[in-house]
């Protein structure tokens, strides 16, 4: 399944989530990650996120079983999602 994760956390905690998410996903922009994962990998990632979560953290995980179920448009100087490794 395709996964998009975005986070909004205090600056001192961004390193925690960036490191955690880069293990499985492509780092698209500052707090945006994208990739193709199995259901088991998504569950493991969510468990890791939950173990690091503090009350001031906000993380959203979008999951798409059908890659054609959503569309995207990229503006400016940005790589297409899925076009590079992290």
Curated annotation (Swiss-Prot):
Gene3D superfamilies: 3.30.70.240. PANTHER family: CRISPR-ASSOCIATED ENDORIBONUCLEASE CAS2, CRISPR-ASSOCIATED ENDORIBONUCLEASE CAS2 3. Pfam families: CRISPR_Cas2 (PF09827). This is CRISPR-associated endoribonuclease Cas2. The gene is cas2. Its EC number is 3.1.-.-. Its cofactor is Mg(2+). Homodimer, forms a heterotetramer with a Cas1 homodimer.
């Amino acid at each position: 399944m395709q996964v998009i994760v975005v986070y909004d956390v205090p600056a001192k905690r961004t390193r925690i989530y960036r490191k955690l998410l880069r293990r499985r996903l492509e780092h698209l922009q500052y707090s945006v990650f994208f990739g193709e994962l199995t259901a088991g990998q998504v569950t493991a990632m969510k468990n890791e996120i939950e173990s690091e979560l503090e009350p001031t953290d906000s993380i959203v995980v979008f999951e798409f079983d059908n890659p054609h179920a959503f569309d995207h448009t990229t503006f400016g100087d940005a790589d297409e999602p899925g076009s590079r490794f992290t």
